[in-house]
Amino acid sequence: MKTYEFKLATDAQEIAAYFALRRAIFAEEQQLFCGDDVDEIDQFAYPIVAIATATQQVVGVVRIYEAKPGIWYGGRLGTHPEYRKGWQIGKGLIYKAVTTANTWGCQQFLATVQLQNVRFFQRLHWQSLEEMAIRTHPHHLMEADLSFYPPNTEIRPILSLPAREAS
């Protein structure tokens, strides 16, 4: 069985791989964005990666950010196409994202989830708050049940904005 490490992307190589995988998924594969998917939120979002322990390759991504005190969002959740069999990576990224935010004072954790992934999130103790369209694609605004995502020991790093630039 393949194993993965779920962690904050902290060094230049991890951050470059994080943005490259996002670009491959959201701009090239899904064509939700032209060129790349970097936006203003990336200036204050924390990137989280799934790393295949055997190869040290970044195979999954998600970002978290505090929209206002206590209100956190997750977004840009994606898995490398060659690693999509099963839900292990997505589940691990979601768990790492929500438990990390919960450690840092999260009172509510939200995400806009593509329609095809809503049932998966519901199995992970999320509820749909409303249906919406983003870039003409159906999504649900969903909320995590924080009681299933206990705080961990992750120390909140100081953001290094230049390192967050897309490569």
Residue ranges and their predicted role:
Residues 1-47, 51-57, 153-167:
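Short amphipathic alpha-helix that is part of the acyltransferase structural core
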Residues 43-44, 70, 135-139:
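Short acidic/glycine-enriched loop/turn segments that link adjacent beta-strands
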Residues 49, 56-66, 70-78:
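Conserved beta-strand in the GNAT
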Residues 49-51, 141-145:
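Short, well-ordered beta-strand micro-motif
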Residues 79, 85-99:
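Conserved acetyl-CoA-binding loop-helix of GNAT-fold acetyltransferases
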Residues 82, 92, 102, 119-123:
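Acidic/histidine-enriched, beta-strand-rich ligand/metal-binding domains
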Residues 100-114:
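Conserved GNAT acetyl-CoA-binding A-motif
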Residues 115-138:
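Conserved active-site alpha-helix within GNAT-family acetyltransferase domains
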